Amino acid sequence: MYRIWYITLVGKNPKSLTGIGTQPEALQRQGKHVPAIFFRTEAGGEPVRDWLRGLPSSEDRKRIGEDIKTVEFGWPIGMPVCRPLGDGVYEVRTSLVQNRISRVLFYIDKKGRMVLLHGFIKKTQKTPDEDLELARSNKSKHQRGLK
């Protein structure tokens, strides 16, 4: 399972991020406690998928994908991989190359899916308020039915 997930997430073409958000019900049957899906805007954009595609390093994408996979299979999971931020929003914490740190903010929806709301490279110790507010806004939109 790991090899298939990794190849579809990173593969040779970083624009083919299809390992997340495809057939979540089938993935739950394969042992995932909370299959990850991308939050989708009204316009059809997927902010986390777009952010991942824009990362310059395939090693960064691989590390983030591994940590998301760890949460999918190990939920509920705590530090150092995952931390609650309040209001039902959590962060996946990933150490990247060149001593950088990324965060992918998510929540668990009523269907038991890990909805990836927002991703960013951390530049300060504290999670920036604007990033947390954006994730909360995306969560509200998703809960209102904007998938």
Go through each PLM region and give its residues.
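Basic, Lys/Arg-enriched alpha-helical interface segments
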Residues: 1-101, 110-114, 121-147
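Hydrophobic/aromatic beta-strand elements that line small-molecule binding cavities or substrate pockets
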Residues: 104-105
